[in-house]
C-alpha cells in the first residue's frame, strides 16, 4: 500500500502512536560536526536494546536525494550513509545489538514489483531527458544561454541499488570499514554486537530482520522484555512490528514533509519548473522563493507499536463473543485485513481504497461477521479460508454501493474544484492548478501597467510568498513566447510587477472591466478531467466490462473468475506466512496484473494452498536479468548485456523498449498498472546457462549467495572466544553462548575475508572523514541464525515473562473528580521532565505580552443589525502608567460596526464582555476570543461573553487575564 496514504490514515486515527524524537545536536552553529556521547542516557527517556536498520531506506535518500544537491561521487554517497547511520544511532543508542540489513534477492512475488518500478524509472528518466533537451533547444533557439550538459558518467542510475551490481559490492566493503572504525573509535560501540546482512544474503531487508527476531524469540535465552527499534519508512513495517507480538517494539522514521521544493532539472535553480526555465539567467533578484531553499535536517519520529496495540485492543473488543477474546489473535486478523487494501505482492481489490476508509469498512464488517464465524480469521500466520470467504461475501454484497458512492464523491469533488477555480478567477487569484489565492472583499485589486509584453495581470496589494510565485510564474510563461530582444523589456516589467504599489491607470480600469465581462473559466483553461473511464464501475454491467477490459474474458466465464480469485487467495496465504513464518515459496507469484472482485470469492473456502514443494532464490545476477530494463544493462557482465538488446536473443521479449501503462481509473501514470510481460523463469535460466562461463572471478563472487557477518570490539566480553574461532580458520560452525552476547543465539565460523585485529585497515572510501585505521580493534566472523525444523511453526503470541508497557491512552473509566486531573503522556515516559516557567518567567511573559490576542470572527445574521463582530479584533494594549488609557484594541468591526454607539463608547469594555459577546474586539488582556453568537453585554456582572475567552474589563489592574472560556459565561477577573 502507499506509504504516505497508510501512514497518514494511521496517524490521523491513532495520533498518540507518534512522538517526536529528541536528539542531541550533531552540528554547532557554524555547521561543523561535533561528536555525540552515546554512552549517556537516551534523550528520549527510553533505553533501547536492539536497533535494526532497513538499509535501503537509508541508501536511496543518501545517493539520490530529492531535497538537496546530489552527491558528486560514490565516496560522498558512502560518507552520507555513514553520517545517516550515526544520526540514527545517536537518537536510539542501542545497548545490545545493531542489525544492518540490505535488500538481497527477493522472492518472485516481490521481483515482479521491482521489475515494474525499475522499468517505470527507466521510462520516466527517458521522458525527462527528452523534455530537458526540448527545453534546452527552445532556449538556445531564442539565443538564451543554457547550462552545459552533464557528463554521462555524472548521472547516477538508482537501479544500481539492486543485489549483484558492482555498486552494492563496494557498499558492502564500505560498511565493513565503517563498523570496524566505530568499534575502534567510539566507546558506545564497545559492548554491542553488530550484524551485517549485505545484498548477497537472500531476502528483503525488513524480512531478514523479522526472521532474526522470530528465531531469537524461539530460543529460551531470549529476553521477552527486549526493547526493539526498527528504522525504516515502508508501511509494512508497522504490520511486521505487530506480527512480532513483542512487548516493546518501536519504529523510527523520518518525518514526512509534503511539497518539498525541487530544483529545476535544467538550470538547478529553485522556484520554477522545467517548462518555466529561462536557462542560466541570474534569478536571484526575483526574491527568496527563487533562491536555494534553506537546507534543514529532517526531524525523526517514533511510531510506538505498544500504543497502536492499545488503540486496536479497544477498537477490536467485541461484547458477548461466543468464544474467548484473545487480543493477540485479533491483532493478527487486523494485519490480515490490511493486506486486502494493499501490499507489495498483490494488487488491491477494486472496491477497497485506503483513502475511502477501506480499512475501517473491513474492521466494521469483521466485527459484524465474527459472531457468525465463531472464531478468528488466522492462526500463526495461516488463514481460515472458510471464514475469509464469509468476510468477502459480506464485502461483495456492498460492492455496487461502494462504486456508486465513489463516483458521487468524484463528481462532487470535480464540482467543488470548478467552483473554487471560478471564485479564484473572480477575485483575481488566478486559476492555475489551485495555486491562486482570492483577496478579501475589502481589498481592491491592483494592476500593473499595460506597456511592453506583459498583459494586465491582477496582483494582490499585499504580496505573500505564494502570490509572488504565482505572478512570477505567469510572467515567465508569457515572456517565453518572445525572442531574446524582448528580454530586457520583460525584466523591467517583471520588476515593476513585484514592486507594484497598487495604483491603477484609466487603461487598467477599462481592462479590468473588460475582463469582468468575460467568462470566469475559459474552455482551454478547464481542468483536465482525467482519462476516459470505459469500465464505469458505477453503472450496471460493471463486472462484465471489467473482465473484458482487464482479462479479455466475459464475466459469464465463472471458472476463470474463480481461478483468479483462487490465485489471489493463494497470494494472501503466501503473504501472511511471509510475515509470520518466513518465505513459504521463493518462486510463487500472482500471475495477473489485476485483482478480482470481492464477490468472486464465493468458493475460496474449498481452496487449499500448497507450498510444500522446495524452492530456492535466484542468484543475484539472475535477479538483475529479471528486473532490469535494457537501459540499466551497464551494471551487468558484458556478455549478459547482449541478451537484453540483440534481436536474436531468446529472451529479447522480456525487455520491451516501451510498454503501456493502464491508469486503471487513476489520474497519474505512477498510480497506474505497468503492463509488462511476466518473466518466464524456465526460459530465462536456460538462456543464462550459455553465458555463465564468461563470468570473471569478481563477477562470480557477486553472483553467490553469501552469509551474515557479526562484529564485536576488543572490549567485548566475547572477544577472546571470537578470536579463537577466527584463528582456527575452520569452516565448522560453532554455537554461541547467549550469556556472553546479550542473549544472541546462533552459530559462527571463520571469515576468510575479514581483517584481523591489530592490523591496519585501509579505508575503501576516499573521503576526509573516512581515514585509514592504523590499528583495527574489531573482529568479524560469519554468523548463522538458530536452526529450526522445516515444518516448525513459530507461535504468534506474547512470550511468557513479558511485561506489559505502561498504558499511554486515557482509561475509559477515568474519573477526573475521583482520580484527579488526567495528565496525558508525551513521549515514552510519563514521568519525563516537562518544561515550565518559574515566577520570574511568568512575570517576564506578562510584562512583554500584555495585550490580548485578536478575537475570531463573530456570528453574522441575515439582517443588517445582526452583523455584529464579523471580523477578528486586534490585540489590546494596556498602558501600565495610565490606567485611563486601557484600550480594547481594534473592535471586531466586521462589515459594519454595531449600530449602538452608546454601548461602543464604554471605554475599555470592548476587550471584555463586548468583544467576547460579539466575537471580535481583542483587548484588555485575554482578548475577545472567537465570539460565536450575539449575547447582550451585562455591565453589572462584567461577563466575558460567549467565545474563546472574554477579556477583562478595561478598569482592571495588571496583570490582566481573560475570563470567559469558550462556549460559556466566564467572569473576568484578575489575580
UniProtKB/Swiss-Prot annotation:
One GO CC annotation? nucleus
Ranges of Gly residues compositional bias? 850-860, 886-895, 908-932
Residues covered by region (Interaction with paxt-1): 534-787
**What induces its synthesis?**
Up-regulated prior to molting.
Keywords, comma-separated and alphabetical? Developmental protein, Exonuclease, Hydrolase, Metal-binding, mRNA processing, Nuclease, Nucleus, Transcription, Transcription regulation, Transcription termination, Zinc, Zinc-finger
GO biological process terms on file:
miRNA catabolic process; mRNA processing; negative regulation of miRNA-mediated gene silencing; nuclear-transcribed mRNA catabolic process; regulation of development, heterochronic; regulation of vulval development; termination of RNA polymerase II transcription
Report biased composition (Basic and acidic residues) as residue ranges: 804-821
Tissues of expression: Expressed in the pharyngeal myoepithelium and intestine. Also expressed in several anterior neurons including the sensory neurons, as well as the interneuron PVT and the pharyngeal motorneuron M5.
Q: Name one Pfam family in it.
A: XRN_M
Region annotation (Disordered) ranges: 424-443, 505-532, 804-975
- Entry's EC annotation: 3.1.13.-
Q: What class of enzyme is it?
A: hydrolase
Drop me one GO molecular function for this one: 5'-3' RNA exonuclease activity
Cellular location(s)? Nucleus
Q: Which residues form the CCHC-type zinc fingers?
A: 262-279
Instruction: Please classify the protein's predominant subcellular localization into one broad category.
Output: nucleus
Description of the deletion phenotype = RNAi-mediated knockdown results in impaired miRNA degradation leading to accumulation of mature miRNA passenger (miR*) strands. Defective molting owing to failure to shed cuticle from the pharynx in the late L4-stage larvae. Suppresses the vulval bursting phenotype of let-7 mutant. Reduced paxt-1 expression.
Would I find Cell cycle among this entry's keywords?
Answer: no
- InterPro entries associated with the record: 5_3_exoribonuclease (IPR027073), Xrn1_helical (IPR041412), Xrn1_N (IPR004859), Xrn2/3/4 (IPR017151)
Domain of life where this protein originates: Eukaryota
The keyword Hydrolase appears for this protein: yes
The entry's family comment says: Belongs to the 5'-3' exonuclease family. XRN2/RAT1 subfamily.
Its subunit composition reads: Interacts with paxt-1 (via N-terminus); the interaction is direct and results in stabilization of xrn-2 in the complex.
Task: Describe the function of this protein.
Answer: Possesses 5'->3' exoribonuclease activity. Plays a role in maintenance of steady-state concentration and turnover of microRNAs (miRNA) by degradation of mature miRNA. Degradation role is enhanced when in complex with paxt-1. Partially redundant to xrn-1 in miRNA guide strand degradation. Implicated in differential regulation of mRNAs such as let-7 by controlling the accumulation of mature miRNA. Positively regulates molting of the pharyngeal cuticle.
What name appears for this protein in its UniProt entry? 5'-3' exoribonuclease 2 homolog
Amino acid at each position: 500500500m502507499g506509504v504516505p496514504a497508510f501512514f497518514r490514515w494511521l496517524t490521523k486515527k491513532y495520533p498518540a502512536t507518534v512522538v517526536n524524537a529528541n536528539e542531541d545536536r550533531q552540528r554547532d552553529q557554524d555547521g561543523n560536526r561535533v561528536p555525540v556521547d552515546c554512552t549517556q542516557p537516551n534523550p528520549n527517556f527510553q533505553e533501547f536494546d536492539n536497533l535494526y536498520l532497513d538499509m535501503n531506506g537509508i541508501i536511496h535518500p543518501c545517493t539520490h536525494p530529492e531535497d538537496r544537491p546530489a552527491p558528486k561521487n560514490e565516496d560522498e554517497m558512502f560518507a552520507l550513509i555513514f553520517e545517516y547511520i550515526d544520526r540514527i544511532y545517536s537518537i536510539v543508542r542501542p545497548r545490545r545489538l545493531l542489525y544492518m540489513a540490505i535488500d538481497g534477492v527477493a522472492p518472485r512475488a516481490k521481483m515482479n514489483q521491482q521489475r515494474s518500478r525499475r522499468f517505470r524509472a527507466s521510462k520516466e528518466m527517458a521522458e525527462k531527458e527528452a523534455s530537458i533537451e526540448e527545453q534546452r533547444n527552445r532556449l538556445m533557439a531564442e539565443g538564451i544561454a543554457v547550462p552545459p550538459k552533464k557528463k554521462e558518467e555524472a548521472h547516477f542510475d538508482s537501479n544500481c541499488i539492486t543485489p549483484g551490481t558492482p555498486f552494492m559490492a563496494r557498499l558492502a566493503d564500505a560498511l565493513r570499514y565503517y563498523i570496524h572504525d566505530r568499534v575502534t573509535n567510539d566507546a558506545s560501540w564497545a559492548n554491542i554486537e553488530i550484524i551485517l546482512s549485505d545484498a548477497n544474503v537472500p531476502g528483503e531487508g525488513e524480512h531478514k530482520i523479522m526472521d532474526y527476531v522470530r528465531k531469537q524469540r524461539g530460543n529460551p535465552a531470549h529476553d521477552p522484555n527486549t526493547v526493539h527499534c526498527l528504522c525504516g519508512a515502508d508501511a509494512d513495517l508497522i504490520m511486521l512490528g505487530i506480527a512480532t507480538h513483542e512487548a516493546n517494539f518501536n519504529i523510527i522514521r523520518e518525518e514526512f514533509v509534503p511539497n518539498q521544493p525541487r530544483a529545476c532539472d535544467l538550470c538547478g535553480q529553485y522556484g520554477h519548473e522545467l517548462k518555466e526555465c529561462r536557462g542560466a539567467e541570474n534569478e536571484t533578484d526575483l526574491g527568496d522563493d527563487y533562491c536555494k531553499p534553506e537546507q534543514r535536517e529532517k526531524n525523526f519520529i517514533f511510531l510506538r507499536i505498544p500504543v497502536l496495540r492499545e488503540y486496536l485492543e479497544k477498537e477490536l473488543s467485541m461484547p458477548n463473543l461466543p468464544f474467548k477474546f484473545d487480543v493477540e489473535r485479533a491483532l493478527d486478523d487486523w494485519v490480515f485485513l490490511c493486506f486486502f487494501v494493499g501490499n507489495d505482492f498483490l494488487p488491491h481489490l477494486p472496491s477497497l481504497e485506503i483513502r475511502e476508509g477501506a480499512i475501517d469498512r473491513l474492521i466494521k464488517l469483521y466485527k459484524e461477521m465474527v459472531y457468525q464465524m465463531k472464531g478468528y480469521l488466522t492462526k500463526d500466520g495461516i488463514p481460515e479460508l472458510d471464514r475469509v470467504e464469509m468476510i468477502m461475501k459480506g464485502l461483495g454484497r456492498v460492492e455496487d454501493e461502494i462504486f456508486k458512492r465513489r463516483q458521487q464523491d468524484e463528481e462532487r469533488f470535480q464540482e467543488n474544484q470548478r467552483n473554487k477555480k471560478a471564485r479564484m478567477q473572480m477575485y483575481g487569484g488566478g486559476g492555475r492548478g489551485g495555486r491562486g489565492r482570492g483577496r478579501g472583499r475589502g481589498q481592491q485589486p491592483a494592476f500593473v501597467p499595460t506597456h511592453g509584453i506583459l498583459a494586465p495581470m491582477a496582483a494582490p496589494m499585499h504580496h505573500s510568498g505564494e502570490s509572488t510565485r504565482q505572478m512570477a510564474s505567469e510572467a515567465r510563461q508569457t515572456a517565453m513566447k518572445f525572442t531574446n530582444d524582448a528580454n530586457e523589456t520583460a525584466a523591467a516589467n517583471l520588476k515593476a510587477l513585484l514592486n507594484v504599489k497598487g495604483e491603477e491607470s484609466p487603461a487598467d480600469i477599462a481592462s479590468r472591466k473588460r475582463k469582468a465581462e468575460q467568462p470566469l473559466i475559459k474552455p482551454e483553461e478547464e481542468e483536465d478531467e482525467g482519462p476516459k473511464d470505459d469500465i464505469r464501475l458505477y453503472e450496471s454491467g460493471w463486472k462484465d466490462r471489467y473482465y473484458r477490459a482487464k482479462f479479455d474474458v466475459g464475466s459469464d466465464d465463472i471458472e476463470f473468475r474463480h481461478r483468479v480469485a483462487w490465485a489471489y487467495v493463494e497470494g494472501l496465504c503466501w503473504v501472511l506466512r511471509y510475515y509470520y513464518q518466513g518465505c513459504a515459496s521463493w518462486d510463487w507469484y500472482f500471475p495477473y496484473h489485476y485483482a478480482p472482485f470481492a464477490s468472486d470469492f464465493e468458493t475460496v473456502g474449498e481452496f487449499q494452498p500448497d507450498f510444500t514443494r522446495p524452492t530456492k532464490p535466484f542468484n543475484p545476477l539472475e535477479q538483475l536479468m529479471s528486473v532490469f530494463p535494457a537501459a540499466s544493462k551497464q551494471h551487468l557482465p558484458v556478455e549478459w548485456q547482449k541478451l537484453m538488446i540483440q534481436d536474436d536473443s531468446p529472451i529479447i521479449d522480456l525487455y520491451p523498449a516501451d510498454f503501456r501503462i493502464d491508469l486503471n481509473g487513476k489520474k497519474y501514470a505512477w498510480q497506474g498498472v505497468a503492463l509488462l510481460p511476466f518473466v518466464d523463469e524456465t526460459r530465462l535460466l536456460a538462456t543464462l546457462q550459455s553465458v555463465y562461463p564468461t563470468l570473471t572471478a569478481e563477477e562470480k563472487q557477486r553472483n553467490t549467495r553469501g552469509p551474515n557477518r557479526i562484529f564485536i570490539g576488543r572490549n567485548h566480553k566475547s572477544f577472546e572466544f571470537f578470536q579463537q574461532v577466527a584463528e582456527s580458520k575452520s569452516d565448522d560452525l560453532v554455537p554461541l553462548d547467549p550469556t556472553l552476547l546479550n542473549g544472541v543465539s546462533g552459530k559462527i565460523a571463520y571469515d576468510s575475508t575479514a581483517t584481523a585485529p591489530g592490523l591496519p585497515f585501509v579505508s575503501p572510501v576516499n573521503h576526509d572523514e573516512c581515514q585509514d585505521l592504523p590499528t583495527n580493534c574489531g573482529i568479524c566472523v560469519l554468523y548463522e541464525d538458530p536452526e529450526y525444523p522445516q515444518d516448525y511453526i513459530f507461535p504468534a503470541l506474547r512470550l511468557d515473562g513479558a511485561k506489559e508497557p505502561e498504558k499511554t491512552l486515557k482509561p475509559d473509566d477515568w474519573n477526573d473528580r475521583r482520580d484527579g486531573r488526567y495528565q496525558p503522556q508525551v513521549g515514552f515516559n510519563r514521568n519525563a521532565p516537562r518544561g515550565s516557567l518559574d515566577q520570574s518567567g511568568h512575570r517576564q511573559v506578562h510584562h512583554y505580552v500584555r495585550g490580548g490576542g485578536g478575537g475570531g470572527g463573530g456570528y453574522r445574521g441575515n439582517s443588517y443589525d445582526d452583523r455584529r463582530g464579523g471580523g477578528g479584533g486586534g490585540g489590546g494594549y494596556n498602558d501600565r502608567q495610565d490606567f485611563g488609557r486601557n484600550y480594547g484594541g481594534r473592535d471586531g468591526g466586521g462589515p459594519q460596526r454595531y449600530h449602538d454607539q452608546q454601548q461602543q463608547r464604554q471605554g475599555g469594555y470592548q476587550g471584555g464582555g463586548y468583544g467576547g459577546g460579539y466575537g471580535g474586539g481583542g483587548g484588555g488582556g485575554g482578548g475577545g476570543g472567537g465570539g460565536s453568537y450575539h449575547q447582550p453585554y451585562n455591565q453589572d456582572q462584567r461577563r466575558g461573553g460567549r467565545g474563546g475567552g472574554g477579556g477583562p474589563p478595561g478598569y482592571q489592574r495588571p496583570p490582566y487575564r481573560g475570563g470567559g472560556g469558550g462556549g460559556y459565561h466566564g467572569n473576568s477577573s484578575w489575580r
